[in-house]
């Protein structure tokens, strides 16, 4: 079984293979330095935000960066129905992305409105987008937004 680990603060990522009592290091690098927004694995690729290069696609097997994009800021990501839902922790911007190793492919975006008035001026939206039964849920402190994303 493969075990992938990632952390922020300059630590980076690591892929291990576990076979019974034997653990083998596959790679360790600083391509994916994900603080707390999570990553999504689809096929042989990982998608998420890495401190420094921004939103990235990483080859799961080799650890190499496939592409990066700094169009919008650090945040969390979720996946449903063939799309990535990425949310900026600072601005409340939500972006719909096509997961592709061919490059950053944006299919729409919006700004979360209204946003919480109790969040401090430097406060962040650290909750992950949640998708269930055709609905996208986004929480900002005391507010929960629900969007119908069913096809």
Describe each PLM feature range.
Residues 1-151:
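Noncatalytic, solvent-exposed loop/strand surfaces
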């Amino acid at each position: 079984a493969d075990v992938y680990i990632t952390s922020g603060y300059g630590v980076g990522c690591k892929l291990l293979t576990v076979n019974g009592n034997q653990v083998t290091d596959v790679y360790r690098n600083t391509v994916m330095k994900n603080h707390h927004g999570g990553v999504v694995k689809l096929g042989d690729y990982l998608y998420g935000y890495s401190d420094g290069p921004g939103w990235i696609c990483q080859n799961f097997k080799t650890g190499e960066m496939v592409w990066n994009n700094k169009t919008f800021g650090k945040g969390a990501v979720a996946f449903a129905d063939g799309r990535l839902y990425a949310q900026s922790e600072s601005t409340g911007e939500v972006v719909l992305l096509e997961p592709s190793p061919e490059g950053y492919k944006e299919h729409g975006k919006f700004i979360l409105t209204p946003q919480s008035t109790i969040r401090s001026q430097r406060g962040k939206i650290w909750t992950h987008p949640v998708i269930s039964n055709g609905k996208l849920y986004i929480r900002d402190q005391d507010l929960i937004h629900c969007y119908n994303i069913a096809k």
